[in-house]
Curated annotation (Swiss-Prot):
Name this polypeptide is given: 2-dehydro-3-deoxyphosphooctonate aldolase
Protein's organism: Helicobacter pylori (strain ATCC 700392 / 26695)
Gene that produces this protein: kdsA
GO MF terms held by the record: 3-deoxy-8-phosphooctulonate synthase activity
Pathway given in the UniProt record: Carbohydrate biosynthesis; 3-deoxy-D-manno-octulosonate biosynthesis; 3-deoxy-D-manno-octulosonate from D-ribulose 5-phosphate: step 2/3; Bacterial outer membrane biogenesis; lipopolysaccharide biosynthesis
Catalysis performed (reactions): D-arabinose 5-phosphate + phosphoenolpyruvate + H2O = 3-deoxy-alpha-D-manno-2-octulosonate-8-phosphate + phosphate
Length: 276
């Protein structure tokens, strides 16, 4: 979020459901997020996935797919005036998704996939690369450089300013801590901000991968705590998944915040910014 340590003009807020469940569900969540979207201190993006291609189980809900999913995101964009983030898992999806999305996100498990990074970077969308749960934060500079050199071959090394100018961001979402658990090393925020703007993913950071018999679990009560800590360290924005009924969400319900909980969290974080 925007503090003295934040170099972007506004604090980025990326919020929305994990996966597209229906257009009605998207509209419901988008409506609840209007107070945050209208906050002049925030640069707001609505997020949702058209396909969750890395679900633990084959039986788990993945989403409506590329074509139908993008149609629904385009509807939200037109009806609410929101900028859009969605993630892509395969190279061929990038150019199609970029017709709707303002940010294309590369999932954490795919953060080293050169072909995917290159295809996404050839679009006009901002590139948001999630740090893999298995990655040394210092090594994310090489993923950033793949994107930067795709956009400008003259770039030899990644810097914060160069990445900001060329629309290449990183996203911290925790590191593997034994089996079925994650921990956030707050030092990674400072490390990665040496070579790119950094978004903190508060809700995936509290995930417990594969912790619910073929599904991931988590504890959303820790998300505000980690987000406040990240804001104090210094970040460029917040990523948080939200749902009107997390317990019945079709993906990552245990991690998600209700819209009113997210609004309170953002209010608290904006107060923290004023301390620096």
């Amino acid at each position: 979020m925007k503090t003295s340590k934040t170099k972007t003009p506004k604090s980025v807020l990326i919020a929305g459901p994990c996966v597209i469940e229906s257009l009605e569900n998207l509209r419901s969540i988008a409506t609840k997020l209007q107070p945050l979207a209208n906050n002049e201190r925030l640069d707001f993006y609505f997020k949702a996935s058209f396909d969750k291609a890395n679900r633990t189980s084959l039986e788990s809900y993945r989403g409506p797919g590329l074509e139908k999913g993008l149609e629904m995101l385009q509807t939200i964009k037109e009806e609410f005036g929101y900028k859009i983030l969605t993630d892509v898992h395969e190279s061929y999806q990038a150019s199609v998704a970029a017709k709707v999305a303002d940010i294309l996100q590369i999932p954490a498990f795919l953060c080293r996939q050169t072909d995917l990074i290159v295809e996404v970077s050839q679009t006009n969308a901002i590139v948001n690369i999630k740090k893999g749960q298995f990655m040394n934060p210092k090594d994310m500079q090489y993923s950033v450089l793949k994107a930067l050199k795709t956009r400008d071959k003259s770039i030899q090394s990644p810097t914060y300013e160069t990445a900001l100018k060329n629309g290449v961001w990183l996203c911290e979402r925790g590191s593997s801590f034994g089996y079925g658990n994650l921990v956030v090393d707050m030092r990674s925020l400072k490390i990665m901000r040496e070579f790119a703007p950094v978004i903190f993913d508060a809700t995936h950071s509290v995930q417990m991968p594969g912790g619910a018999n073929g599904k991931s679990s988590g504890d959303s009560s820790f998300a505000p705590i980690l987000a406040r800590a990240a804001a104090a360290v210094g970040i460029d924005g917040l990523f948080a998944e939200t749902h009107v009924d997390p317990k019945n969400a079709l993906s990552d319900g245990a991690n998600m915040l209700k819209p009113d909980e997210l609004e309170q969290l953002v209010t608290d974080m904006l107060k923290i910014q004023n301390l620096f």
